[in-house]
């Protein structure tokens, strides 16, 4: 997507907007209407709200997947699951068993989906193998992973790595490799400091979510924080050849003017929620149903 003379990834804007919208739907009043369906000749009642949430989540995930961006699909799907889990626990703490069932179903579906992809697109198996055995695919899929491995194995405490490989080319490949480029040029101490800063930032976001008293604000903090944390973790794993190769970037670390502006705007949004952490917008009745306030 182009804004003026600057280009920005559509997913950079779409994902936070989808998350904010999804939280809004989670906060809707409980509708008592049920849809009756039969599974194996057994009648089952499903709440209208649940069906609507599932459909909206699926539509947004499919739209993101059409870009295509498997990294964004993964982050958005995990984000939705975490938000639904948080909502269920906030409604009633003894919903933990239901949450575990939800994650169990999601895990089974996820594994089935991955197996189908590997069966129908065998080249994906080579791409995964190339991450952990880059020497076998040095001329194609394993080229980036091999250069990262060379940098990691020869990196110094300070200064440039002994075997720079194609560090400059890696940096030019995109903002996803900013961390390994820092390791190549400045050493383990600086790159470790960045990782520690990311961990502390993630812990701060989690603590902020706990401190928010209002349910709507809490879910917004959880959703946006989860997005930042997942992006950071998956990017770090990818940079150190411990995770899949995808379009993961580290917020505030990966370069890109427009992406940085969007991330700063989202951070400002989080801070505006946090400064109202002790305020209730409306009086809420906290019974066995969700709060309808912000």
Question: Language model features by range: what are they?
Answer:
Residues 1-26, 37-50, 65-72, 136-138, ...:
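Membrane-interface segments at transmembrane-helix junctions in multi-pass inner-membrane proteins
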Residues 22-32, 81-94, 200-212, 270-278:
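Structural signal for the C-terminal ends of transmembrane alpha-helices
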Residues 28-55, 94-98, 278-294:
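Transmembrane signal-anchor hairpin modules in multi-pass inner-membrane enzymes, especially those
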Residues 37, 235-294:
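A juxtamembrane structural motif centered on a specific transmembrane helix
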Residues 49-66, 70-119:
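Hydrophobic alpha-helical segments of polytopic membrane proteins
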Residues 96-192, 216, 220:
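Hydrophobic, glycine- and aromatic-enriched re-entrant/interface helices and adjoining loop segments
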Residues 185-203, 263:
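Hydrophobic alpha-helical transmembrane segments
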Residues 208-253:
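Loop-to-helix entry and N-terminal half of a specific, functionally important transmembrane alpha helix
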């Amino acid at each position: 997507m182009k804004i003026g003379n600057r280009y920005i990834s559509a997913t950079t804007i779409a994902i936070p907007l989808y998350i904010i919208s999804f939280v809004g739907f989670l906060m809707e009043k409980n509708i008592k209407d049920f849809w009756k369906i039969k599974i194996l000749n057994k009648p089952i009642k499903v709440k209208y709200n649940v069906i609507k949430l599932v459909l909206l989540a699926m539509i947004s995930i499919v739209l993101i997947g059409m870009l295509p961006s498997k990294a964004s699909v993964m982050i958005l799907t995990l984000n939705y699951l975490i938000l639904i889990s948080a909502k269920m626990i906030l409604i009633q703490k003894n919903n933990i068993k239901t949450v575990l069932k939800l994650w169990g179903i999601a895990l089974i579906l996820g594994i089935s989906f991955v197996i189908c992809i590997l069966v129908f697109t065998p080249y994906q198996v080579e791409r995964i193998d190339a991450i952990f055995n880059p020497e076998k695919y040095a001329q194609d899929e394993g080229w980036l992973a091999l250069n990262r491995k060379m940098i990691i194995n020869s990196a110094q405490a300070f200064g440039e790595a002994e075997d720079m490989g194609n560090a400059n080319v890696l940096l030019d490949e995109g903002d996803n490799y900013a961390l390994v480029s820092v390791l190549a040029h400045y050493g383990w101490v600086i790159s470790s400091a960045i990782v520690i800063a990311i961990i502390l930032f993630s812990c701060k976001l989690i603590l902020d979510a706990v401190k928010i008293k209002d349910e709507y604000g809490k879910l917004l903090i959880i959703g946006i924080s989860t997005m930042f944390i997942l992006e950071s973790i998956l990017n770090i794993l990818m940079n150190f050849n411990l995770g899949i190769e995808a379009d993961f970037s580290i917020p505030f670390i990966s370069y890109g003017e427009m992406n940085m502006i969007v991330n700063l705007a989202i951070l400002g949004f989080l801070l505006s929620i946090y400064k109202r952490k002790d305020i209730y917008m409306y009086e809420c009745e906290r019974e066995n149903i969700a709060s309808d306030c912000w």
